Amino acid sequence: SFPFADESFPFDDTALVFKVHGKMFALLSLDDQPARINLKNNPERNIELREEHDWIIPGYHSNKRHWNTVIVEEYASWELIKEMIETSYKLVWQKLPKKVREGSV
């Protein structure tokens, strides 16, 4: 769990959204098999990840420059997925206004 993160279903009952102070850092599709999760990353890193792993594709219904969709296959690297979730959270956290970040401590 991440500080000040919460989850909700703002779109429908199959898209679980994770936010920090109202800003999305992950979207998990619950009705897809295998599961899919959209995560934010740096544009250059997104390109690298897509080239290295066929289970990472441009973000579905997202800005494809900044977001990836991770297809959670059984052969997917759980360590990499955890790292990507953490990176997504940190990138969104860093974009929050300073007064929000400092008021959250």
PLM regions and their residue ranges:
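Charge-dense, helix-prone N-terminal extensions
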Residues: 1-105
